[in-house]
């Protein structure tokens, strides 16, 4: 029953998000005022093209994960916790949808925490499958709370300087306050706080455990949406709210954000190369890809912004595909490491094929969506004269090819180890 409610709610959310995309395409941005109080005093939802696409991404990922959970929950979660699981999942989905819809900076904090609270509980529920889910959930709780606190402190600085929490009104008032130390401190606190939520290096310690040990339903949904929503909010603040776009915080972006993003792209790719557990490998890969997106944003140009958002959407689809394929294989074949996945294509051809397609796109094989997104980032970097970013992207892409190649080699070309468990219950996932 709880699964049916979850699927029905997710179908409704996806349908509404699709309708919203159509309305925005026809009429431009949409503003909805709550309670009859006009902004900036009243609470407002404001949806533009990017917000509508993010809503569609979140709702679609939620629908796919909800449908998928019909087979995975019985194996990964105790029966008495199924209702709790689906309730938390819908709460998390609602919070993220509110986050990309609101036009109020404080309500963005509220929605961010609504989604996070649901996520903490959902990761912990995975302890039935792996006891490491409990410390992973606790680590996420601690880091998430620190990130939320930083965001709230930064928002307090901005409110003290502007006297408003409405994003559009705040942007208008900040134009004359660009030299304010209070505003600059608020900028730094907000970017760092959201960076923790987005798993920005070196504040990403919560992510590998959360992705690796959570139930498949949550791994799929988190991989597609959680860090992406925080990155979306960073982009909103950097390009839409602070004066003169990203040029306002250019010193912070140039000397802090961009170097950390470059380090993440390379260091976390190296960690993925040497990781043995498949889910943790994909988790480190996600941190590296966050670095790719932040490098695009750090260019402080419209081309960099569009390239970063394209890469964000592409990566969400790729990671959702990869975690669904890994989850399907793990349910039937009971594996964790690359050695245990060896030769799996013979027993599970369809899931292996999906895994191969997702891996190829993640590596940036030509004609895939991953290649197109990386190419757009490279073009933006060259247009901005930032050749060093192109070099970083090239090195990180080669490292991506290495760890993706390990997965493909194990799945398609390596012989299965003697006595390895193979398809259970007669299924061919």
Give the ranges of each region predicted by the language model:
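Hydrophobic transmembrane alpha-helices and their helix-loop junctions in integral membrane proteins
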Residues: 64-74, 89, 93-108, 120-375, ...
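Interfacial loop-to-transmembrane junctions
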Residues: 414-429
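Short phosphate-coordinating micro-motif centered on Lys-Gly-acidic
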Residues: 113
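Transmembrane helix-loop-helix hairpins at membrane boundaries of multipass inner-membrane proteins
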Residues: 1-87, 168-172
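Internal alpha-helical transmembrane segments of multi-pass membrane proteins
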Residues: 4, 340-343, 422
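Acidic/polar loop patches that form or flank catalytic/metal-binding clefts of enzymes
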Residues: 2, 353-354, 419-420
